[in-house]
Amino acid sequence: MNKKHHSNNILLNLGIESLNEMQEVAQDVILNDNNVLLLSPTGSGKTLAFLLPIFEMLQPEILSVQCLILVPSRELGLQIEQVWKKMGTDYKVN
């Protein structure tokens, strides 16, 4: 299954019909730039805005750690983990 098709399934798994403008722009910028800062209100979709491009960059043939997400609190880390699991990817998160 290609990444584009899987991305559509991710949105379905999350009950989302389409990305909002911030998420679309963020995805393009994250995939094409090394340094990104997202400033957007709580509940605007920042987590998905950065998780989707991470998913796009992961390589299934690499079995070691490919991504490390640093967050300022355990609670935020747990929230991000929950979103990733709801996305329904084949990649492990912990």
Please state what every model-predicted region is.
Residues 1-39:
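Conserved pre-motif I regulatory segment
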Residues 24-36, 47-62, 83-87:
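Walker A/P-loop NTP-binding motif
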Residues 12-13, 36-37, 51, 70, ...:
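Hydrophobic transmembrane signal anchors and adjacent membrane-proximal interface regions, especially
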Residues 3, 15-18, 22, 50, ...:
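Helical mechanochemical/support elements of P-loop NTPase systems and associated helical scaffolds
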Residues 1, 17, 55-69:
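Long, low-complexity, intrinsically disordered polar/charged segments
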Residues 40-44:
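The conserved Walker
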Residues 4, 8-9, 63-94:
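Conserved nucleic-acid-binding Ia/Ib motif block in the N-terminal RecA-like helicase ATPase lobe
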